[in-house]
Amino acid sequence: MVARLTRLIILALTLFSLHAQAGLFDSGSSPHFVTVNQAFGFDFSQNNHNVVLRWKVKPGYYLYRQQFSITGTNAVIAGIALPSGQPHEDEFFGKSQIFPQDVQIPVTLKSTLPGATLKISYQGCAAAGFCYPPETREVPLSQVSTTRSEAPATAAATPAPVPEPQSGPAVSRLPFSPLWALLIGIGIAFTPCVLPMYPLISAIILGGRRDVRASRILLLAFVYVQGMGLTYTLMGIVVAAAGLRFQAALQSPVILLSLSAVFILLALSMFGLFSLQLPSSLQTRLTLWSNRQQGGSLSGVFLMGALAGLICSPCTTAPLSAILLYIAQSGNMLAGGGTLYLYALGMGLPLIIVTLFGNKLLPKSGPWMQSVKEGFGFVILALPVFLIDRVAGDLWGMRLWSLLGVAFFGWAFALSLKSPKGWMRVLQIVWLLAALVAARPLQDWAFATPGVTASQEQALPFQNIGTVADLQQQLSQAQGKITMVDLYADWCVACKEFEKYTFTDPQVRQEFSQFRLVQANVTANSAQDNALLTHLNVLGLPTLLFFDANGHEIPDSRVTGYMNASQFLAHLRKLRAE
C-alpha cells in the first residue's frame, strides 16, 4: 500500500514538473495579440438620415482619432460628430488623441442615391506596442432624399468633414506654443531700437497733453496697440495662407535648408553684423502718414498703431521676419494670426505701462539692451536647427542643438564676466555647468572611437522587398544563414523604437553579421503590401520573422511587439544556437 502510494506521488510530481517546464519554456518570445477584428469589433446601424458607426475596443487596445476617414459614394454627408479622445503622446508622433474604450460616431446623411456606401478607414494599436495596418470597411446605405433635388455629380463621392483630416493639404501644428510670441514681443520692447521710442510714442498718442483721465489714457494706449495688432494679425493670416498653398513645397529638403539659411542671416543681423529694415523712402512715407493722424482721438490713434506695425526698425525686422517664415511652415491661418497678434500685444504692454504711468517705471537705457537684442539672435537660431533636424535626422539634430546650447551658455558666461557684482559669480558657475552639459553630444561625437562611430551611423544592410516573389527570391539566396524579415511602416511606433534603440546597439549589430537581413516597408498599405502580410499571416506591426537556410520559418521564432537590445540579442543568439 505504501509502495503504491509512493508511486502515485512520484507520478503526480513528475506530471506537475513536466507541466511547469512546458509553461516555462514553450511561451513564445512575444506577447499574444488578437486579430484586428477581435481588437476593434465593428458594427453600424442606419435610421433614415442617421447612421451610427460603432467600435467595440478590446481592453489594452486603442484607436487613433486622427486616423478616422469617412467618405461617401453616391451619398452626400451633412455632418459627422467625431467625439473627443483621450490625450496620448509618444516619442515619434508627438501628441494625439486615442479611443481606448468603445466609441460611436454618428453620421448624418443629406441624401443618397441607389447603391450608396460609406467607406470608413481607421487604425489602432495595442498598448503593449503593436500596431495594425489601416483597416477599411464599406457600409451599404439605404436610399434617403431631401426635399430639394441633389445633383448626381455632387453625390457621386462626398468626403466627410471629419475633424483634423489626414488627407489633402496637411495643416501642421506649430512645434512651439504661440504664447512664446507674447514673451518675444515683450523682450523686443526692451531692445535699443524700441525702448527709447516709447516715451515719444506715448506723447504722440496723448496728443501732447497730460491732463487726461487715467481711464482715457488707458483706452488710447489700448486702441493704439490694437491697431498695431491688426496689422500684425493680417500679416500672419496672409503668410500662413500662402504657406498652406505651398505646403508640400515647404517640406522639401531644399526649401527647408534655404529657409534655415535665411533664419541664420536674420539671427546674424541681431548680433550686429548688418542691419535689416524697410527702405528709408518707404519708412519716411509711412511716418508722414502716421504723423498726419490726430493724437488723442481713438480713430487717429488706431491708425497710428496700424501704420506703426509696418514701420520696422532694425531690432524688429529680423524677429518679425523669422516669425513670419516660421508660421508659413504650418499653413495654419488661425495660429498664424494669433501668433502675430500675441507678438504685437507683447510689444504693446510696456507701451501701455509707459503711457499710463510715465517714464518712472522704465529701466534706464544702457548696454543691457544690446544684450537683449543679441539674446533674441539665439532664439532665432533655434528655428534653423529645428528645420535642419527634420532633414539631417536625430543624430545630427542633437549635435546642432548641442552646438546652439554651448554657444548660448558660453555667450551668457562671457557676458556675466563683465559684471563686478558678487552674486554674478554664482550665475557664472550655472552658465558654465550648463555649457558643459549641453556639450555632451559634441563630446561623444568628437572623442568616440572611430569604430563605434562608424558602427552607429552606418545603415544596416537590409535587402528591400515588396512582394511575395521578392521574398521567395531572397530566401533562396540565404547562403546557409538565417534570414530575418523585418516588416516596417512609418505609422508603427514600435518599429521606430526598434530602429532607434535596438538595431543601433553595437552587440546587436555584431550579431546581425551572422544573419541575412531583409526588410519590407508596408507604409503605403497597398494591395501588394496586404498580399505579403496575408502570405506571412501577419496581424500587425512590428513583426520580425526568421527563416532557416532552407527558407522555412523557424518555429516559435517570430517577434511581435517591441524588444529592447538585451532581449533581442538573447533571442538572436538563441536562434543561432539551435
From Swiss-Prot:
Disulfide bond entries: 125-131, 193-315, 492-495
Enzyme Commission number(s) of this protein: 1.8.1.8
Keywords, ordered alphabetically: Cell inner membrane, Cell membrane, Cytochrome c-type biogenesis, Disulfide bond, Electron transport, Membrane, NAD, Oxidoreductase, Redox-active center, Signal, Transmembrane, Transmembrane helix, Transport
Biological process terms in GO annotation: cell redox homeostasis; cytochrome complex assembly
Pfam family of the protein (one): DsbD_N
Periplasmic-side positions: 23-180, 238-253, 328-336, 389-394, 450-578
Subcellular location: Cell inner membrane
One Gene Ontology term of the molecular function aspect: electron transfer activity
Stretches of the chain found on the membrane's Cytoplasmic side: 202-216, 275-306, 358-367, 416-428
Cellular compartments per GO CC: plasma membrane
Residues annotated as domain Thioredoxin: 436-577
NCBIfam families (UniProt xref): PRK00293.1
PANTHER family, sorted: THIOL:DISULFIDE INTERCHANGE PROTEIN DSBD
Record HAMAP family: DbsD
Family classification: Belongs to the thioredoxin family. DsbD subfamily.
Name of the protein this chain belongs to: Thiol:disulfide interchange protein DsbD
